[in-house]
A protein has these predicted regions:
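Structured beta-strand/loop patches that form or line metal/cofactor-binding pockets in enzymes
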Residues: 1-40, 45-53, 326-331
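Conserved, mostly hydrophobic/aromatic
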Residues: 3, 34, 41, 103, ...
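Flexible C-terminal active-site loop/helix
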Residues: 4-15, 31, 277, 295-355
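Catalytic core of soluble alpha/beta enzymes
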Residues: 161, 168-303, 328-330
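N-terminal small/glycine-rich loop or linker at the start of catalytic domains
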Residues: 113-137, 173, 182, 258
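Metal- or metallocofactor-binding catalytic centers and their adjacent structured scaffolds
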Residues: 5-7, 37-114
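Active-site mouth loops of central-metabolism enzymes
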Residues: 129-143, 192, 196
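Active-site beta->alpha loop and helix N-cap motifs at the rims of alpha/beta catalytic domains
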Residues: 136-146, 150, 167, 171
Length: 355
């Protein structure tokens, strides 16, 4: 079955709960969508929302790339050439992971619809369900406690707390939040590159009694060597996010001494499912766990990340809450959220429907 048309467009979607991280405040998200249609009308949808501060690509650049004329080369091609089509896109857009993610996700959705199987089962299901964390931005303590209480009432049992502006204030916030919620919720921390090695050592020592599950990207990219002074038990707590972009960086970080015990894979960094699974293989061979994260994203790419995550045996953590705070989306379905756990709906492709 041959490809008939491709169509890319951008939507600005408001966030219901604006939030602050170590280097910016977020009030809306700009998401690029890509539709690829076969001659029989079957359509695959991809989406992308890359963070320029992390990968050097904006959604506007993603849209321009998708509308540049390259995708017209796919028209008339057989969808059964699925892998070679994705490889062709990866060769053409080697430094534009947002662009590649939109293409990769759309082709995965379309090809598996054509096969009439879920993407997850195309690769081989390794997991059925896992709990996701929900994120609380940098706020006053009372606001954070209220957010945590609201999330608990909604059935979530894992919090991810944004930190990284002031280590002393972060310690106070995390301790007070833990005092109230540690018996009923796990707590993860994301410093978004905000700490020095001294800050990090102080934070770890001051919160060691709290049983924090993870500490994500504590220091700036390029400063990973400073982490070598930490004992192994502390490095096992650390998650590589901005330091981990693609298979090349995964390979570099997997060399001993390993600065991180876990890799945060985001499709907006890896360039989609194919690139994410390359990272997963490297991590598995190095004995490193997987943590699947996201930006503020459509159900389209969140579902794609979920299918990729559940196809990898070393997946241990999910932080796929990126569509929860969108005021609206362009699709529905994809997965079910129940008591904080994510369940793919197992329809063909990625299982969502356009609204």
């Amino acid at each position: 079955m041959k490809i008939k048309s491709v169509y890319a467009y951008l939507h600005k979607l408001p966030i219901t709960k604006p939030y602050t991280i170590a280097y910016k405040t977020i009030t809306e998200t700009r998401i690029v969508f890509l539709e690829i249609m076969l001659e029989n009308g079957l359509t695959g949808i991809g989406s992308a929302n890359p963070f320029s501060a992390v990968v050097g690509e904006t959604p506007e650049q993603t849209l321009a790339n998708l509308q540049s004329g390259f995708l017209d080369e796919f028209i008339g091609k057989d969808i059964r050439l699925f892998n070679s089509l994705i490889h062709s896109a990866a060769t053409h857009f080697p430094k534009q992971p947002g662009t590649l993610a939109a293409i990769d996700i759309a082709f995965h959705d379309l090809f598996c619809k054509y096969l009439e199987i879920p993407v997850l089962d195309f690769y081989g299901r390794q997991k059925d369900n896992l709990p996701t964390s929900v994120t609380i931005g940098i706020k006053e303590i009372k606001e954070m406690q209220q957010d945590a209480d609201d999330y608990y009432k909604l059935g979530f049992r894992i919090l991810k707390i944004k930190t990284g502006i002031d280590a002393d204030a972060d310690i106070e916030r995390v301790i007070k939040l833990s005092e109230k919620f540690s018996k009923k919720m796990l707590i993860r921390v994301d410093a978004n590159q905000g700490y020095t090695i001294t800050d990090l050592q102080k934070f770890i020592e001051s919160t060691s009694h709290l049983g924090l599950e993870l500490i994500e990207q504590p220091m700036k990219v390029g400063q990973e060597h400073f982490l070598s002074v930490l004992p192994e038990k502390d490095k096992k707590l650390l998650v590589a996010d901005e330091s981990l972009i693609d298979a090349k960086s995964a390979w570099k970080l997997s060399n001993k001494p390993q600065p991180f015990g876990t890799y945060n894979i985001k499709l907006m960094k890896s360039g989609g499912i194919a690139g994410a699974r390359e990272i997963a293989v490297i991590a598995k061979n190095a004995g490193i766990d997987l943590f699947w994260g996201c930006n503020d994203e459509s159900i389209v790419s969140i579902t794609a990340a979920l299918h990729a995550a559940y196809s990898c045996s070393n997946t241990k953590y999910l932080d796929l809450d990126g569509s929860f705070d969108l005021a609206k989306d362009l699709v529905e379905g994809g997965f079910e959220l129940k008591d904080g756990y994510l369940y793919p709906n197992c329809l063909p492709g990625l299982g969502f429907q356009k609204l």
